[in-house]
Structures are given as C-alpha cells and as structure tokens.
C-alpha cells in the first residue's frame, strides 16, 4: 500500500550557520555598536540576550531573516516570554520545534479525516504515517495539509508506492 510520513525536522547545521551569521551581522551593524547582544545555541534552544526590548526585537528580526535565507521555516521556532536578565538586559529563549507532538499529530489526523479520502493515519512517536490504496488520495492529503495553517513546519518524506 502506498504511504508517506509527515515529520517536523530542522537541519541543525543550518540553524548553527544562521546563528553564526546573526552574530556576525550584530557585530557589524552600527546600531548595535557598544551593545552586549548575544545569540547562543544550546541543544534545541536559542538564547537571545539584548540590552533592551528594542534591541531584542531587532536581533530576533535578524535571526528570522537568516533562518528564512537558509530555508528554515519560521514555524519551527517557538518563542518564549521576554524576561529581565541581570542588570538592564533582556533575555528570550526560542525553542526549536523538532518532532510532532501527540496533540499536533491528533490535530493533523483530524484534518486528514475531514477530507473524507480513503486514507488512514497512524501516530508513530514524533511522526505521522499516512497510508492509502490510491497514490492520488495521498497527494490530495499532502495538498490539503500544505493549504492548512497548522502552526507547525511539516515535511513529507518516505513516499512509497
């Protein structure tokens, strides 16, 4: 039976490259001269430290533009709350969304059921497998899911016929 998997993955090398480019741009920009802004990657978290809210927003804008240039979807970023750090610094933690949570997988499964196509979806750890008798039905499911705004970065892999 034809099938495919729905996954949510991020290329960590590209994330590292985007962060390095962000740090480089912050060091070169005139409006950041003399400020103590930092962007660091710790496993699946990006820590942004800035002098004030304005600079924090500017750093996050730079980071997002670098992510987009490196073909990393902004939907794969989950923003934490901006909080006061030591002194007058502001800190924000950005979490990389890797894998599909059970709740999101159920939501995607519900969207697939609403299409009323003859396909089944199974939740497998942090991914979702969709199987069906007809390849055209599977392609229709992919088209529908790409059209929906599910606030998650999805890739469709292992398309088998």
Curated annotation (Swiss-Prot):
It holds the Pfam family DUF520. The keyword Nucleotide-binding applies. One of its GO terms (molecular function) is nucleotide binding. GO terms for cellular component: cytosol. CDD domains: YajQ_like (cd11740). Gene3D superfamilies: 3.30.70.860, YajQ-like, domain 2 (3.30.70.990). Keywords: Nucleotide-binding. Nucleotide-binding protein. Belongs to the YajQ family. This is Nucleotide-binding protein Gbem_0619. It comes from Citrifermentans bemidjiense (strain ATCC BAA-1014 / DSM 16622 / JCM 12645 / Bem). The lineage of its organism: Bacteria, Pseudomonadati, Thermodesulfobacteriota, Desulfuromonadia, Geobacterales.
